[in-house]
Amino acid sequence: MLDKSGFVMVHMKELEIQELSKENWKGTLLPVSYLSDYYYDIWIEKTEDGFHIPIKKKQFEATFRHLPEDGEYPDRLYEDWWENARAFGIVEDGTLLAAIEICPEEWSNRLLITELFVGEEIRGQGYGRKLIDLAKTITIQNKYRVLMLETQSSNVNAVDFYLHEGFTLIGFDTCCYTNNDIERREVRLNMGWFPNQESD
């Protein structure tokens, strides 16, 4: 089918999100990867009356690359330490194209997004937002007080996406991955979405 400009219009079918059972999907590797030309620089400075902690977007000298094999613990579904996790995803012809895993933190009444993956072949089509919206719906239905996730200061695209989806920065950890995360420009950022609270 041609549009008015003469270009071929391709209508792709809408992919459905389904729950991924622990029995079938436990241990499934999520090939999370990203490239980034920018990072959020974090610096902690002690002052006379407290601390000064500027966070500013800066450009990498060379493109930062995060590959699935990086790190001691690659991303997998239903890790043993997430005892009450649930996973949802998009599967086509037996291939996992996208997934989100959530797990309640019962003692604090918070819901954690423990994994979020969207394959390159379907990025930019709104499926990341749909997975996030599903987690938001579960947060509201179960009356959790906040929906939380972890990302990295090196993954500016992810940070900006979460901000656009109504999340806000609620904390960070400067030694989560190594003892020199600040110097490596890969600081863990904790972000949260609060039900019934408008984003500024």
Region spans (language model):
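DNA-contacting interfaces and partner/effector-binding or oligomerization modules
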Residues: 14-25, 32-37
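Short, Lys/Arg-enriched N-terminal segments with co-localized hydrophobic residues
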Residues: 3-11
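Conserved glycine-rich acetyl-CoA-binding loop
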Residues: 93-95, 119-133, 137, 141-142, ...
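Short alpha-helical
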Residues: 22-25, 108, 156-157
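C-terminal "cap" of GNAT-fold acetyltransferases
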Residues: 11-13, 145, 152-156, 165-168, ...
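Acetyl-CoA-dependent GNAT
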Residues: 29-114, 119-121, 132-134, 138, ...
